[in-house]
Amino acid sequence: MIKFENVSKVYPNGTKGLTDVNLQIDQGEFVAIIGTSGAGKSTLIRCVNGLNDVTSGRLFVNDTDVSKLKGKDLRKFRRHVGMIFQSYNLVPRVTVLKNVMFARVPEMNLFKVIFGLFSKEDKLVALDSLNKVGILDKAYIRADQLSGGQQQRVSLARALTQESEILLADEPVSALDPVTAKEVMDDFKRINEELNKTILLNIHHVELALEYASRIIAVKKGKIVYDGPSQEVTKEILDEVYRKEG
């Protein structure tokens, strides 16, 4: 469960990223965050795993108050929350399998990390994750030889290899063509339904958000202006979310 209690985020330059956000996301939900550029979508997601700190309020992931975590405790917490970015964050000249196994590094001792001594279990978990996103056959190919869509699947497999119950995604399909974007969204949907993973992603493709997510959260100027079922999102709601104010 993810729970925001009166969460606000103000950046050092005075910009308000979030203002008094209250929401709860239960385990197994597929939630899409929509809104204009700069509305606060990325800020909201990045607060969940502490990439952005909270200025005021409290933010819980299960029983952990993320807003109070610092240093080592925060790094330990992040191991259990998968994060997929718009940029794939892969090591180009390394195999797909090893890129995915890097998700296990925080659990390894320094000696094993230095020499890349992954366990048999690490390898099996990574291979299973690649299978779940349909690119098991690419395991021993270098990451830089894959298409954009395939690289994003590697990122998703790496997040699965963390064995976290929550997957956060920050504009995961914005750099992909429409066909490939739908294929990656299919992966998210399948993982949500088959593994009961909580999916929280922000996305600028409204039509994809409405098609795949069961719940829509719309953000405007750092405030939640809609939070409800995707099938209840109307043209009037979208007009309000995306209307420019002079």
Curated annotation (Swiss-Prot):
Annotated localization: Cell membrane
Where does the chain bind ATP?
A: G35, T36, S37, G38, A39, G40, K41, S42
Where are the disulfide bridges?
Answer: none
Q: Pfam families, from UniProt?
A: ABC_tran
User: Gene symbol?
Assistant: phnC
Q: Which residues form a coiled coil?
A: none
This molecule's function is given as:
Part of the ABC transporter complex PhnCDE involved in phosphonates import. Responsible for energy coupling to the transport system.
Describe its partners and assembly state.
Answer: The complex is composed of two ATP-binding proteins (PhnC), two transmembrane proteins (PhnE) and a solute-binding protein (PhnD).
Determine if Iron is one of this entry's keywords. Answer: no
Q: Which family does it belong to?
A: Belongs to the ABC transporter superfamily. Phosphonates importer (TC 3.A.1.9.1) family.
Q: Name one GO molecular function term.
A: ATP binding
Q: What is this protein called?
A: Phosphonates import ATP-binding protein PhnC
Q: Which organism is it from?
A: Lactococcus lactis subsp. cremoris (strain SK11)
Catalysed reaction(s) here are: phosphonate(out) + ATP + H2O = phosphonate(in) + ADP + phosphate + H(+)
- What EC designation does it have? 7.3.2.2
Q: What class of enzyme is it?
A: translocase
Topological type in the membrane: Peripheral membrane protein
Q: For this UniProt record, give its keywords in alphabetical order, as a comma-separated list.
A: ATP-binding, Cell membrane, Membrane, Nucleotide-binding, Phosphonate transport, Translocase, Transport
Q: Which InterPro entries match?
A: AAA+_ATPase, ABC_transporter-like_ATP-bd, ABC_transporter-like_CS, ABC_transpr_PhnC, MetN_ABC_transporter-like, P-loop_NTPase
The record lists the lineage as: Bacteria, Bacillati, Bacillota, Bacilli, Lactobacillales
Mention any one GO cellular component term assigned to this protein in its UniProt record: plasma membrane
Instruction: Please list the residue ranges annotated as the ABC transporter domain.
Output: 2-246
Gene3D superfamilies from the xrefs? Answer: P-loop containing nucleotide triphosphate hydrolases
Please give the PROSITE patterns that the UniProt record associates with this protein. Answer: ABC_TRANSPORTER_1, ABC_TRANSPORTER_2, PHNC
